[in-house]
């Protein structure tokens, strides 16, 4: 029995029903199934016109998924890799900056819970947060606030 051929539009809608996708990401996924004569860009334009796909919704979704675990630079880097509009990135950066210290403190608390007793332990904790994309300023503020709470 032959498999039914799923149209590109149906495949795109299935992807979009699971989660928001950027234009670039959806084009890459659909390119695997495109046949000669298929116009992926026209399909993506149609999906955007019908409001099935939105750069703003994708950005908001990605920020919401990543904010609990990662810092501003990691989130912004991922958004840049999806070719998000630079004006949107500026707005997102401003919004993320407001609570970066609190998010760094939350990530640090989940991972470590207590302040390190020596310099090596403190460096390890700082490296962990740096790898997660938090700024030096946010890391120092988060760790300083935690140490003050323990005293």
From Swiss-Prot:
UniProt-annotated location(s): Cytoplasm
Any Pfam family matching the protein: RecX_HTH1
Domain of life: Bacteria
UniProt entry keywords in alphabetical sequence: Cytoplasm
GO cellular component, one term: cytoplasm
InterPro entries: RecX_HTH_1st, RecX_HTH_3rd, Regulatory_RecX, WH-like_DNA-bd_sf
Main location: cytoplasm
GO process terms (BP): regulation of DNA repair
Function of the molecule: Modulates RecA activity.
The family this protein is said to belong to: Belongs to the RecX family.
Name of the protein in its database record: Regulatory protein RecX
Gene source species: Herminiimonas arsenicoxydans
Gene designation: recX
């Amino acid at each position: 029995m032959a498999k039914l051929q799923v149209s590109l539009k149906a495949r795109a809608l299935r992807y979009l029903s699971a989660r928001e996708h950027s234009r670039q990401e959806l084009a890459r996924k659909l390119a695997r199934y495109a046949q000669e004569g298929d116009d992926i860009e026209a399909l993506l334009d149609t999906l955007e016109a019908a409001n099935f796909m939105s750069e703003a919704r994708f950005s908001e979704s990605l920020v919401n998924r990543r904010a609990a675990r990662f810092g501003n630079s990691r989130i912004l880097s991922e958004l840049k890799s999806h070719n998000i509009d630079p004006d949107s990135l500026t707005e997102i950066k401003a919004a993320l900056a407001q609570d970066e210290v609190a998010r760094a403190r939350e990530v640090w608390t989940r991972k470590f819970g207590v302040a390190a007793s020596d310099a090596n332990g403190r460096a390890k904790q700082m490296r962990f947060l740096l790898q997660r994309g938090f700024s030096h300023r946010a890391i120092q503020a988060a760790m300083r606030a935690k140490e003050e709470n323990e005293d």
